[in-house]
């Protein structure tokens, strides 16, 4: 049997055209079937998709196609996270407009995504830079503002003095702006905030209900929210003529360690620090130095611990004669707690590093189990474990928990001034979400600043506030600030000359509700349609990288709650019922003799006695092979999806990214692996052809009786189908691929066993059934090949519209079972016996096994334990 090779270049575009012309994947909101909403995190339109996109969107597409075949009405949309800084950078470099660059990239990437054969409903396509999208975002901003969920206040930011813009913590590298290289300054700017902290407790507690989220993501969010129960302690300042206050408030989660206190430290931007700096040039210089560092927790934690003694002293809460020095320290954050801490060096490594640097000492107050109180000291490593209190007066001998309670009780009862010296308090690490960005290419904040009425909302009838197209990027900073007319407007209340808000929204806002807009993207008079929200949300399966575990996912959870509170989300509070975080696509790195990174396409790999060696295709020079790393432009270890699809076809690329490793782990891209996937495509094509040839044009009717050979074929097909269903239901894509491989191997062997020209009807039926099952099994993963095979089988309709095959579970029940047999808990042999055998038959057969007889050595049997269809244990 000779068959023409499968030609992906000709076949794949043909089927994509048929899907598009027949609107196969267009979803009707009125479809009465049960719903299933699958969504991959939408891409930024950078201009090219990468192999990470291929893997991410292939996984989502497999789920969408599988659920559609199982009878669900599937919503599987696509859009573009289209605002952001790269477009402005491109505008500066290319003297173009961000909109032109963005929309050109969208066109290019849409064509690339379509070439993958994704079952997307393109009629719902959205771009966040489209005024038709962001007008609704502006409306929700105003609704949030009216509901008290938006605030305007001053905040510390990373300021790039060259680019004249605020930088995110991630954009500050070694204290410098990532693009300009300028030393970053800390500035205090007035900014807009979403009050996500109003939902801190709810966001934390609701994590327990997200049972279809990875545990690591829930833990990351819980840690980011950072709920802590502690004590707000008021330390009385020792009165002096220059003392700027009477007390310093400290929030602590470890009041049990108060007797180990050696100092108080306040943040550089604490009000008391500012007052002290007025008369202390050295302190003023130190505060200025602190403002030149990044504001991220990571930057502060890794920096050398430095401080300046203010000269102020506070009294210990339990001993007014015990004075503690007050330092301004570079590791204390003003926006956590009160901006002041007490340092217990013996039991906090950060405090110990600081104390050792300034000779403040360390007195341990928690005694580890089995430690000797007479000899236990702290040198360079703080003790942060459990134990009993010592060196702590009335707390000595108590557990940590009991000591915390006792300190809280005493200080709550002890007055300082006319108030208790301490009170219990719950704190959160989570901070309100600052959304102001000094950028042009973002959603304008719909506010007008009036000299009389302050910040005034833009009337709803005047939305959207659109970006002016006539801007220049010849100078650094925000072009909206320099625009001669756009920002000048009259106040909606009093008509006085006023100014528009020139900050735009953080692009995380755009991606915090797009999943809701997809449910009814044609809605013009409101952001969402209540009936569509009720039908489709929450998203049943959301797919994306774990790098978005905190910010994007947490912001989307907050936004859904805010939408619900303002009437835009019905009763929905959680946006994503199921979350899957896929691994990355990684590749070897290559470097030339000159040390330059090289693209894999420019390298030839040879395998010889000395192992794998790489050579430059152009010069023939040997190239050094580096480590396997995430594909990145900087190290040039990227593979162009267009080249792979153009050479091998989309199905080959899809098959490889699904097959190589568990989906939550990284997949190593190798040329050998891709070629192996391409060979399997050809093998499947030949196998389906052989099965069709052997079964005849129409197969044969289901026979009344069936031969063992035909029964084995049917059993293999239905068993693989059942296992593949289980794997796809659990998102085990690599194991689903393995099931298809396994069935192909078994069917190939069965075809090879045929040695007669005349094929019995039962075999023809079995071959035909197996061919159809195998075709529909691969359809979610290799949809183009499946369509061609489906048509080859004589079907007039599309495989994409065919119902999922019904597995016959009765076929996969073996007539015999294999039972391990133990003697006194140690396995001695295996018993193959009829599945329907009774207890007496199993006991007799087990005792008749020669290994069991030898193990018993003539000893009498006390009892025989039988776990039905699992195991037999003979006790002697």
Swiss-Prot record:
A GO BP entry: leucyl-tRNA aminoacylation
Record-annotated disulphide pairs: none
UniProt GO cellular component terms: cytosol
Main EC class the enzyme belongs to: ligase
Keyword Cytoplasm appears in the UniProt entry: yes
Record's subcellular location: Cytoplasm
Positions bound to ATP: 633
Keywords (A to Z) from UniProt: Aminoacyl-tRNA synthetase, ATP-binding, Cytoplasm, Ligase, Nucleotide-binding, Protein biosynthesis
CDD domains for this protein: Anticodon_Ia_Leu_BEm (cd07958), LeuRS_core (cd00812)
Span of the annotated motif 'KMSKS' region: 630-634
Pfam families documented for this protein: Anticodon_1, tRNA-synt_1, tRNA-synt_1_2, tRNA-synt_1g
Extent of motif 'HIGH' region: 43-53
E.C. code: 6.1.1.4
GO terms assigned for molecular function: aminoacyl-tRNA deacylase activity; ATP binding; leucine-tRNA ligase activity
Record InterPro entries: aa-tRNA-synth_I_CS (IPR001412), aa-tRNA-synth_Ia (IPR002300), Leu-tRNA-ligase (IPR002302), Leu_tRNA-synth_edit (IPR025709), M/V/L/I-tRNA-synth_anticd-bd (IPR013155), Methionyl/Leucyl_tRNA_Synth (IPR015413), Rossmann-like_a/b/a_fold (IPR014729), tRNAsynth_Ia_anticodon-bd (IPR009080)
Ligase is among the record's keywords: yes
Classification via NCBIfam families: leuS_bact
Family: Belongs to the class-I aminoacyl-tRNA synthetase family.
Full protein name: Leucine--tRNA ligase
Species of the source: Methylocella silvestris (strain DSM 15510 / CIP 108128 / LMG 27833 / NCIMB 13906 / BL2)
